[in-house]
Regions:
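Active-site-adjacent segment of SDR/Rossmann-fold oxidoreductases
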Residues: 10, 31-43
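C-terminal helical subdomain
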Residues: 47, 63-99
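Hydrophobic alpha-helix immediately C-terminal to the catalytic Tyr-X-X-X-Lys motif of short-chain
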Residues: 24, 28-36, 48
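Short, flexible catalytic-loop segment of classical short-chain dehydrogenase/reductase
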Residues: 50-60
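Active-site loop immediately N-terminal to the catalytic Tyr-X3-Lys motif
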Residues: 11-16
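Residue(s) in the substrate-gating loop at a strand-loop-helix junction
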Residues: 5
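Active-site helix of classical SDR
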Residues: 21
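A transmembrane-helix-recognition feature enriched in membrane-embedded lipid enzymes
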Residues: 85-120
Length: 141
């Protein structure tokens, strides 16, 4: 199982390097999955792409419609995807359809819905991220 990110399926301002790494993970995982399938291997490959998870890594992220995910919820979905031999699973449900919507909608329409309606393009506006141990210790003094 490979844990990627929804950031590997949908571009987001202020996340270009992160998105590039996750796009790479998704492409690599899918290629390995196909290679194993072509070899008729009994090894199965599951790639999971969750939305923001409340682990501290994305502190300050604000999501208008889609809730920030709890780690326990994501863990259950990951295990379920593995048990069911799913090749790809977006979390929450429906995120695995992003590629479909990108393929059929004109870019302006896709950007309108995901940027303006869902607010995804502004989720990082107040991002602070997880504070390092040194930063936290300095504030405590």
């Amino acid at each position: 199982c490979t844990i990627a990110s929804a950031g590997g399926m949908i571009s987001n301002p202020k996340m270009s390097v992160y998105a590039a790494s996750k796009w790479g993970v998704i492409g690599w995982s899918d290629s390995v999955r196909i290679e194993l399938q072509e070899m008729k291997s009994d090894v199965h490959f599951t790639t999971v792409a969750p939305y923001y998870i409340n682990t501290g890594m994305f502190d300050g992220v604000k999501s208008r419609i889609i809730p920030i995910l709890k780690p326990e919820y994501v863990a259950k979905r990951v295990f379920r995807a593995i048990e069911r031999n799913k090749a790809f699973r977006g979390i929450p449900f429906g995120f695995h359809f992003i590629r479909f919507w990108q393929a059929i909608l004109p870019t302006r329409v896709f950007d309108f819905f995901f940027g303006k309606v869902f607010g995804i393009y502004h989720t990082m506006d107040h991002f602070t991220g997880r504070k390092s141990t040194k930063e936290s210790a300095g504030k405590a003094s």
